[in-house]
Amino acid sequence: MRLSTLSSLLLGSSSIVFARVPPTVDNQEPIKSTSYFLDDPDFPSHFEFENPETNCKYVSQPWIYNAFNSVSEDMEAVFKYAHPDLHVRIMGHHPFAGYYHNPKMAFVNSLWRLNNCLKDAKVDAKLWAIHGGCDQAWSVQEFYFNATTNKGQPWELTSLWVSRWDEDGLIREVRTWVDAGQIMRTLWDNEIWFNSSDRVHHYDFIPGPGGLPPIANKTELGGEL
């Protein structure tokens, strides 16, 4: 087994047994909204599982809760449960969007970069809900993030993760949705440079969404590709 939190394999069965936890979790701190425009989110004082079953083929909802709920203290926590060949697709049209072929690149280019824009690299992250999982390979996690930016501005973000798990409790595939406008505004306001500066050494072509010019295949430039 790859995860210390797995309890055991059922003998003679392909099901995975995860540590039993109550069907509700009551230790969540109330969310304190920093939004100028919204009242405090209608966030429950305790987390209720749609399916509290822990005798599961894949991962149970209580196990998913324990795995993802620590992201506020450790941004890397999510990727501790990533398969080495995990593929991540960040949906939308913004600097984080794209298809990542390994978890390390996805983490550095998104969560790590975003975390560096937040004061003291601290963020309050909570789960709104968990759907699916258990005997289904796919699960959906709804997150709410709350922090203060390096410039002292209140910051909020809601994110949706759609995850495919294997029978060892590792994530094999992720599609995630974020607020593109919030991401772009946060990077623009809090990064000293926006993807590049005169201190960056460029060794790869970065032509933008339009791709390389047609002349690239007719000159020595084409031989370098």
Swiss-Prot record:
Q: Which InterPro entries match?
A: NTF2-like_dom_sf
Entry superkingdom: Eukaryota
Which keywords does UniProt give here? Glycoprotein, Isomerase, Signal
Q: What SUPFAM superfamilies has UniProt attached to this entry?
A: NTF2-like (SSF54427)
**Which residues are noted as glycosylation sites?**
146, 195, 217
The way this protein is applied in practice is: Phomoidrides A and B (also known as CP-225,917 and CP-263,114) are potent inhibitors of Ras farnesyltransferase and squalene synthase. CP-225,917 and CP-263,114 inhibit Ras farnesyl transferase from rat brain with IC(50) values of 6 uM and 20 uoM, respectively. CP-225,917 inhibits squalene synthase with an IC(50) value of 43 uM and CP-263,114 with an IC(50) of 160 uM.
GO MF terms on file? Answer: isomerase activity
Q: In which pathway does it act?
A: Secondary metabolite biosynthesis
Family, similarity comment? Belongs to the dimerizing cyclase tstC family.
* Task performed by this protein: Dimerizing cyclase; part of the gene cluster that mediates the biosynthesis of the antihypercholesterolemic agents phomoidrides which are dimeric anhydrides. Within the pathway, tstC produces the bicyclo[4.3.1]deca-1,6-diene core of phomoidrides via the dimerization of the monomeric anhydrides leading to prephomoidride. The pathway begins with the highly reducing polyketide synthase tstA that catalyzes the formation of a C12-fatty acyl-ACP, starting from one acetate and 5 malonate units. The hydrolase tstM is involved in the release of the C12-fatty acyl chain from phiA.
The protein, known as: Dimerizing cyclase tstC
Q: What organism does the UniProt record list as the source?
A: Talaromyces stipitatus (strain ATCC 10500 / CBS 375.48 / QM 6759 / NRRL 1006)
